[in-house]
Each structure stands twice: as structure tokens, then as C-alpha cells.
Amino acid sequence: MKTYSQKASEIQREWLVVDAQNQVLGRLATQIATLIRGKHKPTYTPSMDGGDFVIVVNAEKIRVTGDKANQKIYYRHSNFPGGLKRTAYKVMMQTHPERIIYFAVKGMLPRNRLSRHIIKKLKVYAGESHPHASQSPKVYAVKG
């Protein structure tokens, strides 16, 4: 039996809506990473982007376990000497709650050129509404 390899013309993408309300950050991010990579499909091919578009709503209502709300810090660097910037989880939640889910999912993708293309299929919104109604997205029930 030959190994199946998906072709670009055979890719069928769906739009899915995920509600992040009262979901644990890491557990939700793993499921989203699986969806945007396409690993939930039987036609999964590691070298092809066969995943679905994922719209995450209610990012401001995500929760973290333990004491991460007080201890978690996000780092970025300006590439200048002494340019390390730190942002606490609480500050990030108040200013840009959508970035919390974005960074969690991005950290679960492989570090290669394909992942930079895959992460563009993730759309995160802090509130209940999103501008992708014309794609008629399906509601995805989060496991767990």
C-alpha cells in the first residue's frame, strides 16, 4: 500500500468558530493548533497546509490554571542592545487579550516556513462578534 500524499488541488478548507469562554488556555490552544494544521483530517500531509480556518471569539474570557495569572510573562526583543521587553499576563489580558491565544497557538506549531503560513488562518477576537459571517463558519465544540 502506498503512502497518501495530498495535493494542493485536493485541499478543502472549512471555517470553524471556537468559543474560548471559560476554556483553559493550553488545552484550547492544542486543539486549535491541530485544526489549523489539518491533523484532524485523514488526508493530513506534513508538508502541505491542509488545515481549516479557525475563528476564536471571547478571547477575553479565557482562563489559566494555577498562579499563571500572576506569574506568566510574555517576552519580546527589539534586536537592539538592552531591548528586552516584558509584559505580564494581566497587562496583556487588559490591553490585547487576543494575543494571548495567538502566542499560545503559535508556540505549538513547528518552527518552519509552513507554520508562518498556517498561523495566518487563525483569527482571534476579544469579544463575541467577528467579521467573518460571510464565510458561514461552523461552530466547533471544544473537547474537554
Swiss-Prot record:
Coiled-coil stretches noted in the UniProt entry, renumbered to this chain: none
Pfam families the UniProt entry points to: Ribosomal_L13
Source superkingdom: Bacteria
Gene Ontology, cellular component aspect: cytosolic large ribosomal subunit
UniProt-listed CDD domains: Ribosomal_L13 (cd00392)
UniProt KW keywords: Ribonucleoprotein, Ribosomal protein
Gene Ontology process terms (BP): negative regulation of translation; translation
PROSITE patterns in UniProt: RIBOSOMAL_L13
InterPro entries documented for this protein: Ribosomal_uL13 (IPR005822), Ribosomal_uL13_bac-type (IPR005823), Ribosomal_uL13_CS (IPR023563), Ribosomal_uL13_sf (IPR036899)
GO MF term (any one): structural constituent of ribosome
Record SUPFAM superfamilies: Ribosomal protein L13
Oligomeric and partner information: Part of the 50S ribosomal subunit.
HAMAP family: Ribosomal_uL13
Family, similarity comment: Belongs to the universal ribosomal protein uL13 family.
The protein's role, per its UniProt record: This protein is one of the early assembly proteins of the 50S ribosomal subunit, although it is not seen to bind rRNA by itself. It is important during the early stages of 50S assembly.
Protein name, per record: Large ribosomal subunit protein uL13
Organism: Herpetosiphon aurantiacus (strain ATCC 23779 / DSM 785 / 114-95)
Gene: rplM
